[in-house]
């Protein structure tokens, strides 16, 4: 029995290391591709208490130790005074990490409850209030960048939300200037899959704090989109990867936005543009690959792993 427990522990450690390596690689690639973090940056890491922001802080702290540049981190949590919110959890956790942090206390919960009729979604107002407070806090802390924990699935969901309900080809940018024009906002987990973050968070044992506002509201449009994408992912492995790659491979000449591409000046002397009238590039598209998700079976007593060299 003791040997079985030992082997199970090794398997768990192997799986954890494997996931961490993949998330680190994807995060590092996103940071490099979009120049998210520069030498001397002070990054305000927005920590909600959910799996995404915990993972983001974890990975950024890990990258900080090996990065070729120097940057500092300060974790910030907004205590919105939701009933039952365990105010002690995050300070205790952050103290144990030894990371600089700040807890901002603002009763946005009462404002949202007062302004939004019962049965209506609170996300929009809650988000606006939260952004304003975080922008102010970033200025007070002297932060050069604000890091949010949105991942690849969030970005795709936003794209489909805007297509289905807003009539726009618009997603969630990995890097942008804040609404008030004073801050640069980054999303280091932009290349990371939610399924990886869920597994990693479970293995890490983060003290997750559920949101009693957003998560408790049924039939949200985003939840419907998420369910649709999850269904596609199960039925057609690789489709999610292909769709996200499409967001990085936009061909304006083959869309219909005349402000994005100058269609009016096209004539027979313009030549063939981006393949001309070929509507589907299947022959030229690389085969979508799904990253290896295989996990070592935790209860296999025959497993022999040396995790010290992983």
UniProtKB/Swiss-Prot annotation:
Gene Ontology biological process terms, A to Z: tRNA thio-modification
GO MF term (any one): ATP binding
Keyword Transcription regulation: no
Residues engaged in binding [4Fe-4S] cluster: 123, 126, 214
Keywords on record: 4Fe-4S, ATP-binding, Cytoplasm, Iron, Iron-sulfur, Magnesium, Metal-binding, Nucleotide-binding, RNA-binding, Transferase, tRNA processing, tRNA-binding
Localization of this protein: Cytoplasm
Keyword Metal-binding recorded: yes
Function: Catalyzes the ATP-dependent 2-thiolation of cytidine in position 32 of tRNA, to form 2-thiocytidine (s(2)C32). The sulfur atoms are provided by the cysteine/cysteine desulfurase (IscS) system.
Name of the protein in its database record: tRNA-cytidine(32) 2-sulfurtransferase
Species, as recorded: Vibrio vulnificus (strain YJ016)
């Amino acid at each position: 029995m003791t040997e079985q427990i030992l082997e199970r522990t090794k398997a768990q450690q192997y799986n954890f290391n494997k996931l961490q390596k993949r998330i680190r690689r994807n995060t590092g690639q996103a940071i490099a591709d979009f120049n998210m973090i520069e030498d001397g940056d002070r990054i305000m890491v927005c920590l909600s208490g959910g799996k995404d922001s915990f993972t983001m802080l974890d990975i950024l702290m890990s990258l900080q130790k090996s990065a070729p540049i120097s940057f500092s981190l300060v974790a910030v949590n907004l205590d919105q005074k939701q009933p039952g919110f365990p105010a002690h959890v995050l300070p205790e956790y952050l103290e144990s990490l030894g990371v600089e942090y700040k807890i901002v206390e603002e009763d946005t919960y009462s404002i949202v409850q007062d302004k939004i009729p019962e049965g209506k979604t609170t996300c929009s107002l809650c988000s606006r209030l939260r952004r304003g407070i975080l922008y102010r806090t970033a200025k007070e802390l002297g932060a050069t960048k604000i890091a949010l924990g949105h991942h690849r699935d969030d970005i795709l969901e936003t794209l489909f939300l805007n297509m289905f309900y807003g009539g726009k080809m618009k997603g969630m940018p990995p890097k942008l200037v804040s609404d008030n024009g004073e801050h640069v906002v980054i999303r280091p987990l932009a290349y990371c899959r939610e399924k990886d973050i869920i597994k990693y968070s479970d293995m890490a044992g983060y003290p997750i704090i559920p949101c009693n506002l957003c998560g408790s509201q049924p039939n949200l449009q985003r939840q419907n989109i998420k369910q649709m994408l999850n269904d596609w992912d199960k039925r057609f492995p690789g489709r999610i990867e292909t769709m996200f790659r499409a967001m990085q491979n936009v061909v304006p000449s083959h869309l219909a936005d005349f402000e994005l591409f100058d269609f009016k000046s096209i004539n027979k002397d313009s030549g063939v543009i981006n393949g001309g009238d070929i509507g589907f590039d299947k022959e030229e598209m690389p085969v979508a690959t799904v990253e290896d998700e295989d996990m070592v079976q935790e209860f296999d007593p025959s497993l022999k792993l040396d995790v010290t060299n992983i």
